[in-house]
Amino acid sequence: MALTKLVDAGAWQVEVAPAGTVQDSLVFLSPRNFGGVPGTGVDSVAAIEAALAAGDVDLGGEHWFISRPIYCVSGRTIQNGKISTLAAQGSGFMAGSIFAPGNYHPVYVDPVPKLACSSTNGSATITVSSHEFVVGDLVRLSSTRGIIGSDAVLVPWYMQLARVVGVSGDTVKLDAPIDTTETLVVHKATPAGYNARFNKPLFVLERATFRNIEVDTWDYWTADSATFECAFEGIRGKARSVVYGNTFCRTNFDNIDITFSNKASEMAFGSHDTNLSNIKFRADSQNWDSTNSVGISWAESGRRCTLDNWQLLVPQGVNLSVLVRISSHRDVQIRKGFIQVHSSSNNILSVEHYGGDRPPCNNILFEDIDVNATGAAAVVVDVYKSANDSAINAVRFEGISYRGATPSVALMRQRGTTSNQVTGVRASLYSANGGAFLVSSAMAWDVRLYGPGLQVPAAVAVLGRTAVLSASRSNLHALRWVTEAIIGVTSTTPGNVLREAVIPAGTLRASDYIDFVISGSTGGATSTKDVLVGVLDSGSNFQGVGFTAPTTEESYYTVQGRISFPTTGNCLITATIGRAGVGVSYARTLVSISNYTTNDVKLQVQAWVGSSAGSLSVQHGCFAPSELTG
């Protein structure tokens, strides 16, 4: 079936393919009408580009072949079909790519002349002299400092694409605020007269949509990129990477399912405000290329990028250098993910900074991520400052769950330098088979670890807050004793045990402590009254703090304090003892106990009266282990 479509240059026949609709054919163009031949292995790249130059393109559910990347057109949509490369594997870097959605690379952007401009952090206006910007222009801002990359050109500390929405003399108004205090320069994002890879004009792709397309290539399916307000939806197939490129800005990737042979994702060279959702990264063990292979690795001055609802599937035979790494990005959220990996010899989730003129890793969130390692794993979570000027701040790992072999190095690791420590990391991690918590030049963290067999060195307790909750420590729940009922003490046996709790061997950590409160009243003028709180020492003798009320005392009392474990062989008991009409006293005792990693620890509350004529009651009692709250 064919319909006639009128355009400025005349008319042509529009084919309605079986996978399309009449409405699609009325709105979209087919490469067939520009000489393209689907399904035969004929090179149709020129026909597809010609169709895109004329309007939106529908591939009609057919299979198309190309000999080089398709250079896309701003404002266009291409949808509904399969595209395979004809380029021979190894014929050249990105020669087998499917699309070129923009084509930034530091080597090609660096020579573009730039104008000095001034602004303030949070302002949407810049001041720039002798410019030619007009409303509607897309501009690129970048800092004057940065790092010199492997290609010997500048990778700026800060980069931003923005639309010009107002011009008044030297004042240029942008559609988004500046997000830095750096010294900036500016230029047109698509400058005239400058070429990039394959000698194609340097450009940024704006407001284009790629929808429901299967890609088939040994190369990256996106070549050098630079996008602004673009959308990639329903992309599937196989390629060297899943989401890969430079300068993805205000761009969305949704429902992407690609089998990759080298990298899961790299977003580099100033990617910002870009969101990835519903992504499946499937490593291809049959066609794996281990050269510089990584999982998800975001670097080079990015910010405000997100990844939601994703899977990273890494079978046996694929060993990535790192699974998910954030470096020189800020304001990143990676949430609701699942990682299935056979073996990992390095880090699974990491934040790393290598110093120099790189932007800091600030405000990084990993949340609700399940990791399943069927073989071996080295480190599950890692935070690393390699240099004295590395910058990492406000990093959080929330709701991370690990199942698999005990990590050979660490469940969680923090590493800094002597003069530049890692600080302020917050985390909650579960491990089904334990693992170590390792710290080197780090402090002031707040970490909660869940699961059996967790290893936390006693020495780190004073450096940060570490809560360890595990099934092997479940008997600590026996310590959570609260009574509001009045207990009358009638025993006249010294050392009468009113309450005992046993902490099993291997349960305690140096960061644990137990708060206690015992309160009540004494009476009777013919008998002493004793109340003590303590532990059994290494010789099984009771050692504690408390009071003995004389025969004439009739009073209300409160014994309130804390039991802590500063070393594996010592217990420190401190208490404040208040008795109405008597005053307040303080008690402190250090008790030598058997090593709690291999021996039980017994806590006791003892109470007795000197004779049956004495009156002693406990009206409130409470043991509250710190690590089982909240």
Curated annotation (Swiss-Prot):
Taxonomy, superkingdom: Viruses
UniProt keywords, alphabetically: Degradation of host capsule during virus entry, Degradation of host cell envelope components during virus entry, Host-virus interaction, Viral attachment to host adhesion receptor, Viral attachment to host cell, Viral tail protein, Virion, Virus entry into host cell
Annotated GO CC locations: virus tail
Name of encoding gene: 57
Quaternary data: Homotrimer.
Its job: Functions as a receptor binding protein (RBP) and probably mediates the attachment to the host capsular exopolysaccharides. Displays a depolymerase activity that specifically degrades the K63-type polysaccharides of Klebsiella pneumoniae capsule.
Keyword Phosphoprotein: no
UniProt family annotation: Belongs to the K63-specific depolymerase family.
Listed name of the protein: Depolymerase, capsule K63-specific
Species annotation: Klebsiella phage KP34 (Bacteriophage KP34)
Signal peptide start-end: none
Swiss-Prot/TrEMBL GO biological process terms: adhesion receptor-mediated virion attachment to host cell; symbiont entry into host cell via disruption of host cell envelope; symbiont entry into host cell via disruption of host cell glycocalyx
Principal cellular location given in the protein's record: virion
Compartments reported by the entry: Virion
